[in-house]
């Protein structure tokens, strides 16, 4: 029995190391995980309240259409309910879209590096992947447009981008949308949308009416702090969304996930508090980078990508031995960088002290050999 040939060229997704794994491996009692861009402040207290009322529903199938959540999100965003497609996290939404649109003879266009699942599912479906290197850490939309042809089914734009935290400006996006063929679906993955505060960050939902080939992805895993429950969604042209529903598994979002998402959505005060504290945390890292002349990408997310002057894998290992889990840039093809999730203030302070040690050691080595 053999699987598709293209599956043999891929690896299963490898998430960041989990806390218990690192405790066992290094014999540590305290671990701070700053690797997976989770919300360090947790989730709204209303989520806990919602969970207590669900015990009587565990034996029942969930609402496959997610009617109540669909209605509330549509109202919150100012879109129509039939414009929404729900998935077990954005990973499943990406899988559904790829499954429905891609096949051998088609192609997708994306940046490199960016979120790996765009590439992963395109390969599984037999599509050609056309990757365009980031320019100064940002999507090079002009170069991406040059890669689009009549066989291009999807253009992926992760905005803000993972792993760099950078963003595409409004005017550049508008110019791209005016130029790209209507036969290509432009998907804006806005998993980190709530954290983006730049004045020229594009507000894409008002553009959906004009551009039928535009789709937007959002999630409850990041700023809302519901990563464990796996729920994300797409917003797009109602006709296309209806066609994509055919590729959706029955009952793909659980009753629990729908209920906690509803509860989280209703607590916008908690969300805004998290966003504010995240901005303060980013400023801690910016201050360190400027003082120690460390390269970094200004971030519109809850993480920062920086370069310490040593290999990312080395920084990753040394920080992990101290009880701090980050992501090595090698995982994204940037061997000399690391990605760090913004944590609690004291967590940021602690890891920044470790980063200072790494930088100082590297400076001393360079002085010794100079």
Curated annotation (Swiss-Prot):
Gene3D superfamilies: Aspartate Aminotransferase, domain 1, Type I PLP-dependent aspartate aminotransferase-like (Major domain)
Coiled coil: none
Keyword Glycoprotein assigned: no
GO BP: L-histidine biosynthetic process
Cofactor names: pyridoxal 5'-phosphate
Keywords carried by this UniProt record: Amino-acid biosynthesis, Aminotransferase, Histidine biosynthesis, Pyridoxal phosphate, Transferase
Catalyses which reaction(s): L-histidinol phosphate + 2-oxoglutarate = 3-(imidazol-4-yl)-2-oxopropyl phosphate + L-glutamate
EC category: transferase
InterPro entries reported for this sequence: Aminotrans_II_pyridoxalP_BS (IPR001917), Aminotransferase_I/II_large (IPR004839), HisP_aminotrans (IPR005861), HistidinolP_aminotransfase (IPR050106), PyrdxlP-dep_Trfase (IPR015424), PyrdxlP-dep_Trfase_major (IPR015421), PyrdxlP-dep_Trfase_small (IPR015422)
Family: Belongs to the class-II pyridoxal-phosphate-dependent aminotransferase family. Histidinol-phosphate aminotransferase subfamily.
Name of protein: Histidinol-phosphate aminotransferase 1
